[in-house]
Amino acid sequence: SSMESSLYTGDHLFVSKLAYGPKMPQTPLTIPFTHNVIGRKESYSTLIQSDYKRLKGFGEVETGDYVVFGFPHGDTVFVNDPAADYYTIIRTYGRDYAHKLYGPVKVRPSDKKDHYVKRCVAVAGDTLEIIDGRVYIDSEPQEVWPGVQNSYTVVTNGQRINPVNLDKIGLNLSELWYDQKLPGYPALPLTAEMLEKVKSLPNVVSVTENIDRWPADYPDSEKTIFPFSPDFKWTRDNFGPLWIPEKGAEVELTLENLPLYERIITSYEGNELSVRDGKIFINSEEAQSYTFAQDYYFMMGDNR
């Protein structure tokens, strides 16, 4: 999982809805104690819908917090595979082939998106940048929290590392792959503490961090990495700089930076946007700037 070593698949989480303020139901006609499905059918009706409203909480989202939130792309899902990222699949395969491959589509209300849990690494107004796998906020390196792990290539002397030692270090043995040709492990997820322990093992020859640089180490990077545009040479390990929008802030809109803000303006803030003759129109009026109506946050898993 993307939070492995901090949180594990199967863990039971207790979530306070009062911390940041409880969100009022937007889809009140829901079967009690269900979220969006019961069996393979929706557990709610959209007959009654209300606007987004959140009551005041005890505090604000802060950098480093674990946050449970609705997956942003979860407003549209494939009925037969709701865990698949609809928008990434559409970009990768094309709409017609994707629908043929995955089947019918369901549009979900905002409060019925699947829940994700990640760590907040940037809040509204921050400028986020990832350089060789390290997070920087406003040009300053961010604290590396316990539990954050990166991927490493571990070369051995031709012998596998004793599984007992790997288990003691805290690695999930079922997820490890040993490549005889290397010889070694091409992708070991390690925290800083685990890294030092692996380096000290007698049959380890070298340990190198896996860094994804442009051109990306895997195909179709612009289809899987925000803002999903070939004009942005970003990868998961070298990303940004990206300014995180905050309520009331105004940004100049250009055709060059539009991919960064288009989905916020349309999907999250409910505006119509189009581009005609090289000009940007919002709600049928030409726009050279935009003022954000909400604060935004950047979440990231600890398993990086």
Which residues does each predicted region cover?
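Soluble "head" domains of membrane/secretory-pathway proteins
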Residues: 9-304
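Aromatic-capped interface at the extracytoplasmic side
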Residues: 1-3
